């Protein structure tokens, strides 16, 4: 049986507000996800806009490769979701 994959992308969250010693937000569910899941502390966005950045993430390519310049996600062949489907995951 394959492990579940839960992909959570948080837009406009400040790490200092919901984690660490200076935490000022009450986020029990995010706290639980971070404790029991895989947490990446050093992720870097591919672009300054949400849609362009998500498009880069889902296609595993930088924006200049995908040609994304608008507010629409365009999935190329062999994208993140295709890879999951090809490996038996249900999307």
PLM feature spans:
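Catalytic-site neighborhoods of secreted/periplasmic enzymes
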Residues: 56-91
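Short catalytic/ligand-binding loop motif for oxyanion handling, primarily in non-cytosolic enzymes
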Residues: 14-18, 49-57, 66
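Active-site-proximal N-terminal segment of extracellular/periplasmic enzymes that hydrolyze or transfer
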Residues: 1-41, 45-47
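Acidic, metal-coordinating catalytic cores used for nucleic-acid/nucleotide bond scission
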Residues: 47-49, 73
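Generic alpha-helix structural propensity
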Residues: 25-28, 52-53, 75, 79
């Amino acid at each position: 049986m394959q492990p579940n994959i839960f992909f959570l992308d948080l837009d406009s969250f400040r790490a200092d507000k919901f984690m660490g010693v200076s935490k000022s937000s009450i986020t029990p569910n995010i706290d639980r996800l971070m404790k029991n899941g895989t947490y990446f502390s050093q992720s870097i966005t591919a672009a300054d806009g949400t849609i362009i950045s998500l498009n880069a993430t889902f296609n595993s390519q930088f924006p200049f490769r995908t040609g994304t310049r608008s507010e629409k996600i365009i999935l190329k062949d062999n994208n993140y979701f295709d890879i999951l489907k090809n490996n038996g995951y249900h999307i």
